[in-house]
Amino acid sequence: ISSIKTNNKIINVVASIYAKENGLNNCVLLNKEKMVAEFINSNIFIIKNDQIFTPTIKSGCLNGVLRKNLINILKKSSYSISETDISTFDLTQSDEVFGTNVIQGLFCVTNYRNKIYSNNQSQQIIKLLNNNLS
């Protein structure tokens, strides 16, 4: 996975087909180190113990416009945000997970594998984002 936006979206296309064939709304894309890079069509953020984490650009995630804006907004707020490596185990241990892209904005993830997430903090972050972008 590359952080450079290109016309080569074969991984995303194959992942989208896999998701559709298996009744999934989305898939988590992993890099060659088997660390989380992003969702099929969006950046990924996790919340654990009131701290927000998102994969580093080195993970292969796209440095999306909304991702950059949200990180800047969160850094200026009372939230703690860190760019770090995220494993699939981290996803199962998170309190909340959300994604961002310019089409959907910020959306809450309801579940991953057998883990069901709340979305209380994610909803507050949506309000913060909307207030800062309007």
Q: Where are the model-predicted features located?
A:
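Helix-start/capping segments and mature chain N-termini
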Residues: 1-134
